[in-house]
Amino acid sequence: MTKKLSKRMQAAIAKVDDSKLYSPLEAMELLKETATAKFDETAEAHIRLGIDPKYSDQQIRTTVSLPKGTGQTVRVAVLARGEKVKEATDAGADIAGSEELIEEIQKGMMDFDVLIATPDMMPKIARLGKQLGPRGLMPSPKGGTVTADLAAAVNEFKAGKLEFRADRTGIVHVMFGKASFSADDLLANLKALQETIDRNRPSGAKGRFWRTVFVSSSMGPSIPVDINALRDLKFEDN
């Protein structure tokens, strides 16, 4: 049985013209207007790319530093040894440890949003695949989460650095702020995301790379964005 849409959602959907491609700024303004839930909704982008991720040369997994931040408190955990544990804690890591932290994670402790590891810890982390893999939390060099420079990594992820990847159908789902952000700030973050994807275009991608871009608040309707206008946009961060 089809679930009946709430009056709130019906009113939000009515504001979106599905036959139209919205300019990037219009789309941000409409996202804010249709974010009518009783909490500060997350701004989400859903980007369909012309790739087939089953081929290794058509995959995207990388990071973006959102210039206006994520609007969220990011909990960072670090796996390291010796002095590196203190370095991570001093840099602001919420949790830091070595073998004992691995054991806690194995037992189900997942009280973090990002897991960073030093390269020497990776052989031991391999056994955490069952816990970390399904949540996309396994540290990786491509994701910027395997590094010896823990202070820089902790600070970047705390400040608004996000890891993202294309799913098996070639779609990138990623948050880029909060509905309470100004339209200009949301646009600055979306532009940074677009530029990051273009810089990391897989070598095996053929034909039209950008297919569709939709944005929405977490409880709002999808809003189609004019891809060419977004890519042509020269955004000056004041």
Swiss-Prot record:
GO terms for molecular function: rRNA binding; structural constituent of ribosome; tRNA binding. GO terms for biological process: regulation of translation; translation. Keywords: Repressor, Ribonucleoprotein, Ribosomal protein, RNA-binding, rRNA-binding, Translation regulation, tRNA-binding. It holds the Pfam family Ribosomal_L1. GO terms for cellular component: large ribosomal subunit. Binds directly to 23S rRNA. The L1 stalk is quite mobile in the ribosome, and is involved in E site tRNA release. Protein L1 is also a translational repressor protein, it controls the translation of the L11 operon by binding to its mRNA. Belongs to the universal ribosomal protein uL1 family. NCBIfam families: rplA_bact (TIGR01169). PANTHER family: 54S RIBOSOMAL PROTEIN L1, MITOCHONDRIAL, LARGE RIBOSOMAL SUBUNIT PROTEIN UL1M. Part of the 50S ribosomal subunit. This is Large ribosomal subunit protein uL1.
